[in-house]
């Protein structure tokens, strides 16, 4: 029976320390080899937390699958901010263009509850509310109203 370890690691910067080392050590595999491969596979997500799944079979062979970072991490990277606002209703920390929200929605579509791109984009824009990030210079709630009215349907065709 294969053992499975699921962790969030910093993209391209995983180490043999927690959370990976303690989880992989008891399985008797080369932790450094696993860490090196994870860092190769997650290098493009530098600076973001990335979900990683390591499967180890009975013969100590391992396979690594890398997920897509959380929506908040993708939005913050696009906005160029380190963390969201502590007061999202009053303090704005960044802005993302609607096109970036569409791109993020396309990346995350399989993991979302939405059935179509328009609603997935609304989920991403809704996440911007709690981060204190505007969308194309507008408050996220105003952008949601515009999306509902069909004002951006040309961008949302996917």
Curated annotation (Swiss-Prot):
Key word Ribosomal protein present: yes
PROSITE patterns membership: RIBOSOMAL_L11
One Gene Ontology cellular component: large ribosomal subunit
An annotated Gene Ontology molecular function: structural constituent of ribosome
Biological process terms in GO annotation: translation
CDD domains: Ribosomal_L11 (cd00349)
One protein family per Pfam: Ribosomal_L11_N
Record bears the keyword Ribosomal protein: yes
Keywords linked to the UniProt accession: Ribonucleoprotein, Ribosomal protein, RNA-binding, rRNA-binding
SUPFAM superfamilies listed in its UniProt record: Ribosomal L11/L12e N-terminal domain, Ribosomal protein L11, C-terminal domain
Similarity annotation: Belongs to the universal ribosomal protein uL11 family.
SUBUNIT field: Part of the ribosomal stalk of the 50S ribosomal subunit. Interacts with L10 and the large rRNA to form the base of the stalk. L10 forms an elongated spine to which L12 dimers bind in a sequential fashion forming a multimeric L10(L12)X complex.
Main function: Forms part of the ribosomal stalk which helps the ribosome interact with GTP-bound translation factors.
UniProt name for this protein: Large ribosomal subunit protein uL11
UniProt source species: Methanospirillum hungatei JF-1 (strain ATCC 27890 / DSM 864 / NBRC 100397 / JF-1)
Gene: rpl11
């Amino acid at each position: 029976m294969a053992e499975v370890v699921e962790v969030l690691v910093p993209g391209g910067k995983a180490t043999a320390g927690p959370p990976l080392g303690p989880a992989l050590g008891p399985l008797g595999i080369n932790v450094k080899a696993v860490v090196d491969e994870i860092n190769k596979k997650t290098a493009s997500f530098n600076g973001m937390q990335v979900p990683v799944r390591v499967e180890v079979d009975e013969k100590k062979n391992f396979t690594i699958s890398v997920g897509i970072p959380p929506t908040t991490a993708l939005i913050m990277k696009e906005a160029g901010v380190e963390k969201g606002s502590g007061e999202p209703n009053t303090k704005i920390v960044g802005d993302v263009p609607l096109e970036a929200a569409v791109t993020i929605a396309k990346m995350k579509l399989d993991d979302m509850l939405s059935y179509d791109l328009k609603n997935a984009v609304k989920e991403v824009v809704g996440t911007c509310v709690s981060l204190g990030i505007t969308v194309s210079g507008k408050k996220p709630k105003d952008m949601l109203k515009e999306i509902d009215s069909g004002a951006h349907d040309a961008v949302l065709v996917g």
